[in-house]
Structures are given as C-alpha cells and as structure tokens.
C-alpha cells in the first residue's frame, strides 16, 4: 500500500493533475447504466413471453418444463441488470471522490512558487534577517504536504468503499441439458438399429415366401421378347441366303437327275461315256457340298453367333448368272468335250475328258448348245433300216 504521507506534495499533486480526470469514470458509469437498462428490458420481455405461453396457448407438462428451464435465466438477467446498475452508481461515487481529491490537492504551480521563494530567502539570509520568513515558508510547505496527503488518503478511502460495494458477476445458468446431444445421438442410433431390425423382420417373410414359390423360368417372357427383337432384323438376310442355297441345291439336284438318266441310257452301249457322266455328276455334288461348308462357316457354328455380312455388286458372272467367286474360278477350267473333240465317237470323248470337267459348278453347263453332251443325239441316232416290213391290210 502506498503511503501518501511519505510523499512530498510535488509528487502527489503531480500525480493527481497528470491523470485522465473523472471524464473516463463518468463515461464508464453511463455505459454501465445502458447495460443495466438492456438487461432489465430483456428480462422483462423474456418473462412476459414465458408467462404468455404458459398461461395461454401452451399448457401441459412440457410448458412446465420450459418454465422451469427459463426461470433461472430470467432471474440471472434481472440480478445481472441490478449489478450493472450498482456498478454504474459506484463508478459515479469514484468519480465524485476523484473530484473531491482533485479539489483538495495543492496545485503544482503553488508548490513550485513556495519552493522558489524559499530558495531566494535562503540566498539573501546573510545576517539572519530572513530567518522568520524562511520559517513561515516552511510552515506553508508543511501545510501543502499535509493537504495533498489528506486528499490522497481520502480519495483512496472513497474508491475503496465504492469498490467494496460491488459484487462479482456470475455466468449465465445452463437452461438446457448438457447431455442432451449425447442422449440424442444415442436415441438416433437406437432408432436406426430399430428401423434396420424392423426392415429385416419384414424382409424375412418375403424371402421365405419367394423360396416357397415354384421355380420360375430363367428367361422370363419379357427377356425372350427383347431377345427376339434383337435377332429378328438379322433373320431376313439369313432367310434370303437359305433361299438362294435351296435354289442352287434344286438346280444341282435337277442336273444330277439328268446326268443319272443319261448315265442309265448310255450304260448299255457306251460305258465310257456313262462313266464320264457319272464323274461329272459327282464333281457337281462335291462343289455344292463345298459351297454349303463355306456358307455354314460364314454363319457361325450356332447360326446366330457371328454377325451377318454382305456385299452388293461383288458377285462374279457366268454367262447371265451371278455366282460366287469359287464358281467363277471353276468355270474357267471347264472345257466342253464337244468343242475340244470331233463328234465321231463318244468313247474317245469320254476317255479324253478331264477328271474334273464341271470344276465344282452346277450341272447347267450340260445344256450348253453346241458343246458338252450336245453330241449325244448323234450317238443315239439309229442307222437306216435295211428292210421295212410291209403293212398287212388285214391288220387294220
């Protein structure tokens, strides 16, 4: 604790006059008054709303819990507002004490003047004539010392009394349950577990009912319908290819049938020619078999496993007929026997014909005019009869 009596008046007066004054204390008192007024207004409004709800539209146990939770907060606001108001009053007391101490404090210029006068008296006191004046000056300085000390002690006592009346502020009470968030999290987790358990209990009977039902088809009707829609656009080109194959097979069968008939006619009197016809027919059948294998490999082993591919305007021509490339290549190796040999003997034609005269082509070449077996008519022509039996009139 500072002993103001031990300090000279120069120090005490300088401290008092060098401070900010009472203006800061007055401003602080006004702010505390404003805080107190706001708290009183908030407490009054809060209390009015609470009582308005509980006495009017909201009645019940939940309303009672709300009042029990809100009442401590309203009380805290009221108490805090009173404390703020008291603080403002005490700050004003301190400001008044300062003004009193300031008025009692000797001004520093007066003290400085006294000290200057003392120095002059001492300097001119050659024969002791200034001794009474020096004593008076020292007495005045002593009074200044005592006055400043009394002012400072009075100010310290007044401010101490003002601060002792103040009460410490308290924190606002909790109006909610601190464990509410934890309890809410636990409740949510329990609700989720309960919902999952309920869903499981609902799904188990459904699963058992599905197991109890007869086994359904692996491919439902709608899936088969979608599969048919995907396949059906490719069936039309496939059917065209099959139709073309059937036409060529029919042509081959017709040619083979004609060759078989010709073979039967020539077998009796021209064995070599018959053998040539049979060989040509077998070659034609082998050519169609090779064509069928090529078509089957292009369509895939399953018939629908590979994509359908087609080209337009790429077929080769044999005469006026459009044929595959293999047939066109084979057609170049065909050498009609009638064009290569004279029409003197079928035996020589059969012996000199190539082994693969048809070269994998349909038997339509057998009907070429002026070639192939066009000379058969000459071989079958009967010589003129040596004797003609006359017709008997009695025979009718």
From Swiss-Prot:
Residue ranges spanning the membrane: these are none
A GO BP annotation? response to host immune response
- SUPFAM superfamilies tied to this protein: PE/PPE dimer-like
Superkingdom = Bacteria
Pfam families according to UniProt = PPE, PPE-SVP
Q: What is the similarity comment for this entry?
A: Belongs to the mycobacterial PPE family.
Protein known as: Uncharacterized PPE family protein PPE19
Q: Which source organism does the UniProt entry give?
A: Mycobacterium tuberculosis (strain CDC 1551 / Oshkosh)
